[in-house]
Amino acid sequence: MKKKHRIKKNDEFQAVFQKGKSNANRQFVVYQLDKEEQPNFRIGLSVSKKIGNAVVRNRIKRMVRQAITELKDEIASGKDFVIIARKPCAEMTYEEVKKSLIHVFKRSGMKRIKK
């Protein structure tokens, strides 16, 4: 993911948590916050230390980043998202991760997701 699509700072994460809306499925929780003034969407990832070791957590983050890269044309701009991975995604394949992300984005009311 390019820098313009990342949330890195703690206060930006906290703003999305406190002011945003959340949607979830068994694998992911997605918080979203509307920010009409920004031209792009931004994504922040969080994988708890309760989920496996560092290798497993980094693998999950890589798969989520790749799925977001493939779906970036279908994700609405002007929003901040924080994606929190849950334990079941530790055993998932890339295709399952992508399908699960599409499902949770659809539940959050994003009209541009078509798949």
Swiss-Prot record:
Write down the EC number: 3.1.26.5
Q: Which UniProt keywords apply?
A: Endonuclease, Hydrolase, Nuclease, RNA-binding, tRNA processing
What reaction is this protein's catalytic activity? Endonucleolytic cleavage of RNA, removing 5'-extranucleotides from tRNA precursor
Endpoints of the signal sequence: none
Gene Ontology biological process terms in this record: tRNA 5'-leader removal
The family classification in the record reads:
Belongs to the RnpA family.
NCBIfam families attached to this UniProt entry: rnpA
Q: What is this protein called?
A: Ribonuclease P protein component
Instruction: Give the species this sequence originates from.
Output: Bacillus cereus (strain B4264)
Gene name of this polypeptide: rnpA
